[in-house]
Amino acid sequence: MSRRGTAEEKTAKSDPIYRNRLVNMLVNRILKNGKKSLAYQIIYRAVKKIQQKTETNPLSVLRQAIRGVTPDIAVKARRVGGSTHQVPIEIGSTQGKALAIRWLLGASRKRPGRNMDFRLSSELVDAAKGSGDAIRKKEETHRMAEANRAFAHFR
């Protein structure tokens, strides 16, 4: 057993313009090769495009999109005997948000289009409306969990 104390849990910082933790989480996930200023530019341009498309508060669209994509349950591979089962497990809110952001960014990267801010804004607007690739991914995960409900006791 370790003699060291437990590490303090870091709190998520908020971004400088919108003072929002979700925006900062999005920036940190979109970040590539340490280019944080570029990540901020992409996010802020995407937020402006959302404002132009929907003519509503872009942060509420972002919140709605993330809430719509956040999964309640997921499957985890668990080896029992000689076979591997997909065991459904519940997901906490922090992990769910992280998964939702990852799925939204993955779906927007796969989208055809000019640049990342255009694709990200389109994906966020679609997710807020209840369509798009990220929503499909969440529904697929829920279907997998429902199909493997019989293995829930392996937790």
Swiss-Prot record:
Keyword Plastid attached: yes
Transmembrane spans: none
The keyword Ribonucleoprotein appears for this protein: yes
Sections of the chain in a coiled coil: none
GO molecular function: rRNA binding; structural constituent of ribosome
Stored Pfam families: Ribosomal_S7
Function in brief: One of the primary rRNA binding proteins, it binds directly to 16S rRNA where it nucleates assembly of the head domain of the 30S subunit.
Family: Belongs to the universal ribosomal protein uS7 family.
Subunit architecture: Part of the 30S ribosomal subunit.
Protein name: Small ribosomal subunit protein uS7cz/uS7cy
The gene coding this protein: rps7-A
